């Protein structure tokens, strides 16, 4: 009887360890954070992470073996996406636990914020209030495919790499909220600084669309 119980327990923990293996690599966590934003091809993930196609495919296979991602063949490309919404919750839970339990994570956040002069960080609560005002413009800095997948209501899409060339088209009589992929992305702060340096009243919302949706009704 004891042996049956032990085998049962060991089999379950062995299965769960596959999830642990998926999360044991910083690059696999980065891939998951990217896929939270929307489905992507292997080539797109490779470009975003700076890894070779071969390394990207290897990491994706491990994530697929752990059932954290699924894939679909579309023409000449293989497209990957998060397996289900629980995985999205898991990614953000991991980020939140890291921020709370690891002093290094908070130090990195603080040092980066301190290094970015002329930024106006805002909380989600402040952003919700500002979004209700007609004089506020929300800019989503993510690539177009991620914006098309999901975005904050009434936000416009100006990918970070195109922001500087579009500055002349932005209204200076409105407050501007910029957001990107969340707390592990530097673009919101950098975009806020760029806009403020050019005479705008810009605010950095260092939160993701997921954070916006999850917290807006609380």
Predicted regions and their residues:
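Flexible, polar/low-complexity N-terminal or interdomain linker segments that lie immediately upstream
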Residues: 42, 81-137, 141-149
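Alpha-helical residues within the helix-turn-helix
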Residues: 47, 64-65
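Short, hydrophobic-biased segments on the C-terminal half of alpha helices
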Residues: 60-61
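N-terminal helix-turn-helix DNA-binding core of bacterial DNA-binding proteins
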Residues: 15-54, 78-83
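N-terminal leader segment of winged-helix/HTH proteins
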Residues: 1-23
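Positively charged, proline/Ser/Thr-rich regional signature most characteristic
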Residues: 126-184, 190
